Amino acid sequence: DKKLAEHFVVVSAKTDQAAKAGVVADNSFQIWPWVGGRYSIASAMSLAPTLAFGFDVFTEFLAGMRSVDQQLQNTTPENNATLILGLVDVLNFATGRYSSQAILPYSSALRLLPNYLQQLIMESNGKSVRQDGSDSEISTSPVIWGGVGTNSQHAFMQMLHQGTQAVPSEFIGFAKISN
């Protein structure tokens, strides 16, 4: 039993429970209670993908997150793409003008990005109650949907291009393609 417990790795908010179950303390990674779902990707929750892709890839991922944070904090508003995109989203959806947003990556490597952003944005922002418990007076989240642009050209892209309703759409392309 003890030998078996040495081969388990646990990621949990309740590491004390893992210890009671016999998991070696060095094999237990805590999820802090203040880490919300949208940020868990930068926490111990990413242990499985880190092991699958390597620590170097995870370190690069964290460095990318840090560079976006620094760009947001250190760039003037008129040159700040992150801030501008965020403000456009607020104007589009908080005003109730639009109810959905399409995410259209032009790379099959990013085929799951719309699904990830759907979970991230709609779970995080799709609430009718504010942090203080009061009701929100504005629309809180668009319906996020999309797919790889080249695969969608004869499906919903037809509606986006020739339909009667406007849908804010983010097209994601690359200056360099890596295979």
Language-model regions, residue ranges each:
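Active-site phosphate/pyrophosphate-binding segments
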Residues: 2-179
